[in-house]
Amino acid sequence: NYIREVFILQSPHKEHLQHLFDRLQTAIGQVITYEQEPRFNLLSWYSDFQWTVAIFPRKCWRPRQFFLEGNKQIMFSPGCVDMAGLIIAPRKEDYERYTPELLTDLFNQVSINTTELEAIIFHLKQKLSL
């Protein structure tokens, strides 16, 4: 029940993560059409002898409000940190307009939905069972 879907991969062995990540990237590509680069944001960290990778699949890079003009425009182009929950607002006026409802709408536009998540999981399971 989050407003953005995320895959969390963890292992003490980065080679295992690389293997799983490669398969996940392929599964995402079977559901979300790539243009020049894969559509996801990725955060990774190493703590307590454990690697963690968070992958946020994306439908698009920017919501429709980004392309509006004048006072209707909202400069929202979420990167890794934003997708992880720390919202960076490049303009004060946009920050002052943020509400839970608006942020939910913005993230829903750029994030995959539950149906797409389930399709990625289906393709991933097929790859892992080979």
Predicted features by range, described:
Residues 1-130:
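Conserved His + Asp/Glu catalytic blocks
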